[in-house]
Swiss-Prot record:
Annotated family: Belongs to the ATPase alpha/beta chains family.
Sorted UniProt keywords: ATP synthesis, Hydrogen ion transport, Ion transport, Transport
Protein's name in the database: V-type ATP synthase beta chain
Keyword Ion transport annotated: yes
Species of the source: Chlamydia pneumoniae
Amino acid sequence: MQTIYTKITDIKGNLITVEAEGARLGELATITRSDGRSSYASVLRFDLKKVTLQVFGGTSGLSTGDHVTFLGRPMEVTFGSSLLGRRLNGIGKPIDNEGECFGEPIEIATPTFNPVCRIVPRSMVRTNIPMIDVFNCLVKSQKIPIFSSSGEHHNALLMRIAAQTDADIVVIGGMGLTFVDYSFFVEESKKLGFADKCVMFIHKAVDAPVECVLVPDMALACAEKFAVEEKKNVLVLLTDMTAFADALKEISITMDQIPANRGYPGSLYSDLALRYEKAVEIADGGSITLITVTTMPSDDITHPVPDNTGYITEGQFYLRNNRIDPFGSLSRLKQLVIGKVTREDHGDLANALIRLYADSRKATERMAMGFKLSNWDKKLLAFSELFETRLMSLEVNIPLEEALDIGWKILAQSFTSEEVGIKAQLINKYWPKACLSK
């Protein structure tokens, strides 16, 4: 029998303190107001008989005499095939006017997958984006963020990746979204044709911070079930992890916790790692590939959120000036697939293209400062223009093999075969015969 408590001793922000016994961290409770309305709350901490709870939806209209009932279980989300094509909020309730979701209730925020059952990833996730496929391959089960400067179209990039990969299921977790962002996700998933294999967990900017914290846990709990029980390859997209961290900061400040760097809680690294470590490829099972967006306030890479994220993840895509910056981006798992599941020329060609593009940036600086340009500088500048137009632009949408062929053509149009620094065996096989050496 559940005990009802009515001694709410303190209400501060979205937190309440109630005198109760037997509560557990993370336990779910219901609060019934005097007018009959009810809402959920979650136990954040307890001190003897004083239990502090975070109220979902805020404490507006709450009084000290309202009823608090502990449910004896943590937060859960409904899991099942009926989730596909649905949109839910931060507490797992449908927001798409399509009725209730039916299925099995599962716990969220469970421990990460047993490392013994993990396997070393060997498969490439194709995106048809040359700056990813050619230079920083996305590997199945990889955890990787998109570091985005302000004003960049990171949501459009996420949706494009979701539409063009071969994932069986796409799980999207949106945190701190404006109505415009939310509408964009809904419309683009329908327009690009993957809405039926997608489930969205959405926290809007006007919703309670605790719902923001729950969104990645719900998204990852469902993804893990799909991967383990149904052996599906799941792509999880989370945006924006900076909003997630800001929600953690707001909650910790309300709880009077001692702040760490720039006001964020000292547990920020662990809180981020707990979510990122859900990425996994399972032996004789499915996989979870995790791509997130981390916006950088004032384009500051040393901000605590991107700074901590870089120590956890397996690389990053740096989105700047509506391009994936090749110098700030990195995939630490690309060596597992380049030349093994891709063409033999992949690694050498990518290295040559990036090396020459780096040299072209120096030539651009010399031109801007008014120095006299050499013939080599002029070749580099011509190469740079072709490279940025035909490979770097996010408008380019081509398979990996075609991107590699274009890379060879760009080199042949700008340099002689002796100038590119690629071994003769590959030059003889892949150098375009139709392009005359200059």
